[in-house]
Amino acid sequence: MQSSAKKVALPAMTLAALGVVFGDIGTSPLYAFAQTFTSAHVNISEATVFGILSLIFWCITLSISFKYVSIVMRADNNGEGGIMSLLALLLRIKQLDSNKKIYLIALGFVGASLFFGDGIITPAISVLSAIEGLSIATPAFDRWLIPIGLGILTALFMVQRHGTATMGKFFGPITMLWFISIGALGLYSIIQTPHILWFINPIWAIEFAIHQPFVAFVAMGSVVLTMTGGEALYADMGHFGRMPIRLAWFIVVCPSLMLNYAGQGALLLRDPQAVSNPFYLLVPEWALFPMIGLATAAAVIASQAVITGVFSMVNQAIQLRYLPRLTVIHTSDVEQGQIYVPFINWVLYISVFFLIILFESSSNLASAYGVAVTMTMLCVTILISVLAYGAWGWPWWKVTLFAVPFLALDGIFVASTSLKILSGGWVPFVIGVVVFTILMTWKRGREIVFNRLETDALPISLFIKSIGSSAETHFVPGDAVFLTGNPNIVPHAMLHNIKHNKVLHSRNIMVTVYTEDIPYVAKEQRVQLEKMDEHFYRISMYYGFKDQPNIPQALEQAYQALDLEFDMMQISFFISRDRLIHTVGDGMSPWREKLFISMQRNTSPVSDFYQIPPNRVVEMGSQIEI
């Protein structure tokens, strides 16, 4: 029965993966092939068409089919993938000292920052390239393309707060129809010009690079557009598993993409003028409007997948303490991964809106797109090479055989796309720098605050002894919960409570929340308890980086384990609200300190983040100089 269930589940999961994982790379044929010719000013001939098709085929084969599907997807963190999971795996390597880990964290932050930039560009370029088919139908639509695109994307971002669980059921079938359609269009064109299939021979790519080296180099900056979204295979592994994603790639996605690219190449051999929009010029006139509708649906699905990916990455970064607390809303009672981050949603929407106004067309946006993709691929190659050597036990020669060719290939991609910096490539670069600065500043700022608190801290063991020997200590009925980052020192809120209220509660519970480097922690492993004396308890709560912390829920579990009666109305949560003050010192540069203080002031309340009832919270203020 279990085997039968797995057989039924595998096709269903594979279909679902199509709608989430492959939307981005699946819409690349709308613009990537044409952009390769126009950006590099390639003269259309049999040699150049075959050469570029061969480059596309072998780059996809090496970078996606081999590197991502065969190698990178092995790096699963309890089934989860993505740059944050990869970073968590790397930080477990015992041979790495703290200095090397800092460099790896920085590199992981670079990859995460660029993915955020990708989340801004993908919706804009996908939707614009889809609706540009309307201009093929009639030039009258030209002036309406931007308003239509903005309208579609506005609706997409507005619906995020309600969740996409209902619509998500249709993503897989729609994307399957999309891949079947683009594959069929390509096949029909190939039948008319069958010798186009010789592009599979790598000699065409080699000869193109030898005879026109600079043109081939520039073209590589657009060839990479055929691989945009390839990182989603790894990032979404936790949702669907390795096998469904691999099956979808090799059986449906890769064949459909290559058929369509070959079909576009065959069309150019028959009609070089079709380079203006070879994708839509493949479509028969009677099918043009249905295809535009299907392409728009596929583009919206691709955009949704990237938006969801950004939400997930931001949530993981918050749980791992790499970002300040933000409001995270769960939009589904069934699926834990269905979340909505309001602040990030509006940042994405405003950024996408201005991108469309600024660049106006998908061909202009393509210049901005490649930079983020290539640098992310380079970061992943470096990180996975370190993991293979340090954690998988690969010998140095095996790591070298993997790393050198892919570092060279990714290096060529980065160098080629860097030519686009002035014409639009600065956009993801600026976005990446801003996000990277925020990540590093928050991480460093938290370290400084933590060190300041520990410098003036009082060990909890000494405090309990002094309380026990003092006749002046007054205890009042009820339970007090104090959140603390270090369970071995007295929480600031407790000291302030004694200072101002002159009392302690009959039960004082110090709670420390830990985020593990695994996605989920089982309920039975959630809490660890220690009774220090009759008035003091220490509770450690453990969550994975994809769990949503719920302190009252975990506290009830702890009370049951201690055989205590749990009554939320008898519990007060004392939280220290730190007021940071900028000082001249060895911390951070003044502008970074001001940035950190601003982020600290605008974090969402601790009670919201840990799902503590606001009417049970007592905030105790304190000042910390940084």
From Swiss-Prot:
* The keyword Transport is assigned to this record: yes
Instruction: Please give the GO cellular component terms listed in this UniProt entry.
Output: plasma membrane
For membrane topology, the record states:
Multi-pass membrane protein
Cysteines engaged in disulfide bonds, as pairs:
none
InterPro entries reported in the protein's UniProt record: K+_transporter, K_trans_C, K_trans_N, Kup
What PANTHER family does the record point to?
A: LOW AFFINITY POTASSIUM TRANSPORT SYSTEM PROTEIN KUP, OSMOTIC STRESS POTASSIUM TRANSPORTER
Which protein family is named in the record? Belongs to the HAK/KUP transporter (TC 2.A.72) family.
Q: Under what name is this protein listed?
A: Probable potassium transport system protein Kup
What organism is this sequence from?
Acinetobacter baylyi (strain ATCC 33305 / BD413 / ADP1)
